[in-house]
Amino acid sequence: MNLKAITLMQFDSNGRLRHLLTLEGLSRDTLLQLLDCAAQNCALGVDPMGKRNVLAGMAVCTLFFEPSTRTRHSFHLAAQRLGADVLNFDASMSSTSKGESACDTLKNLEAMGVRGFIVRHPEEIVIAQLAAVVGEGTVLINAGAGRSTHPTQALLDMLTLCQAKGNDFSKLKLLFVGDIKHSRVARSNLHALRTLGAGQIRVCGPTALLPHDGLLSGCVVSQDFDAMLEGVDVLMMLRLQRERMEEGLVPSLEHYHANYGLTAARLARAAPDAVVLHPGPINRGVEITDEVADGPQSWILRQASNGVMVRMAVLETLLGCA
């Protein structure tokens, strides 16, 4: 199934957003509406009294076929804060270990009354397959599909950028560093940044870890990390996706850190008020040092807290009127 078809599956017959499968095909206005809702959630804080009943009586399920800390638990907290009943699916303890397909798993849970599915799967196509079989009134949210898409991560990163740098991205210089080829975060972020009118996007990493499918069209691309740091406003550090990589793409972790690890000395080359982002999990001493990850220019924990607020916004937008 091609990307255009998946994009169209997100909308109902009236053009209303029904699922969140990818940020591709979503308008600037739609992204800004989601970000504005998330910003309102930030203003309400961790105990949003006025939103406790938005999803009251509704069952949602975190249907994860891959490990997760931040995404799974932030979705769980987001749904709870909106009053939903949350089911946490454990693939290792389910009938998928007996051969049941993801589609059959979803349809059975749907028959029990679950109306919102938050899905992570290592195979990109499965998200589209699930969207094709869900019933009317059931909502599907992509929580990470293979190496292709992670829409809510990109949304929380955009919210963090707004907080750090304001709402106008047109003059920003942003640098993505690391394993771009296997990163669903990088792909979704690049689509969001283009839709929101980002200024200069730079990409840096070993040649073997850069995609050659047109994703980097319009980006400034280099293997020279030190040169690319000059004047950068935002650094997005990405981990090596070793679970998706072929052996031998990187000589060693030590070699990678020497060439692409963000240290305090390297960070000093960027703009004085540059901010550092990382979607997690962090591999300390590989793509980033402790000093930088825990330093004053790190917005990494803000990303984590924003994850709850963004995912609340997505849930209430899609399920609040379901």
Swiss-Prot record:
This is Aspartate carbamoyltransferase catalytic subunit. InterPro entries: Asp/Orn_carbamoyltranf_P-bd, Asp/Orn_carbamoylTrfase, Asp/Orn_carbamoylTrfase_sf, Asp_carbamoyltransf, Asp_carbamoyltransf_Asp/Orn-bd. It comes from Xylella fastidiosa (strain 9a5c). The lineage of its organism: Bacteria, Pseudomonadati, Pseudomonadota, Gammaproteobacteria, Lysobacterales. Keywords: Pyrimidine biosynthesis, Transferase. The keyword Transferase applies. GO terms for biological process: 'de novo' pyrimidine nucleobase biosynthetic process; 'de novo' UMP biosynthetic process; amino acid metabolic process. Carbamoyl phosphate binds at residues 70-71, 120, 150, 153, 280-281. GO terms for molecular function: amino acid binding; aspartate carbamoyltransferase activity. PROSITE patterns: CARBAMOYLTRANSFERASE.
